[in-house]
């Protein structure tokens, strides 16, 4: 298949992008270097429109090819406040911050898709590339939406994915309906008599 052959050709370069992003992780809404990296790559690929600073540090790129559906592809960019213990050439250079959830990979995959789609234009319509900040519990998607993401760049459908270590290389896992749950917070207050954990019968 032509697409697999092209990505095989790009593999080494794409791997370099991922390692660069992994070595320079940034926390929620602080993805300034990452956003600049993304925007520069999109410009290099010949993406038709590039919009920065959406919802803080979000980036949107648009690839056009005639009339047709508008399809959104989304990836997250932020890292976590974790000290990396790995020993590798691309270990985090930002002390106390690490790409422990694979968003460096997500960003890289969407950049790879952007390059391929911009090169080939083998579709009709528009592809909206959405690089989201602050996925890790800080409502980066909401920030982009509140900043007019879908008013400015409406889509007919939108797709995202999450890496899943343990899957065989070259395979993907899919299923009907939502596949990832969102987290929420709540507080509950209990009034009653307390006791020691070793003597719960006294409570």
Show which residues each predicted segment covers.
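Acidic/His- and Gly-rich active-site-bordering loop/insert found
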Residues: 1-99, 108, 115-123
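Histidine/acidic-residue-rich, glycine-tolerant segments that coordinate divalent metal ions
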Residues: 59, 80-82, 87-98, 105, ...
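Short, well-ordered amphipathic alpha-helices
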Residues: 113-114, 145
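Residue-level detector of alpha-helical segments with a strong bias toward transmembrane helices
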Residues: 112-113, 202
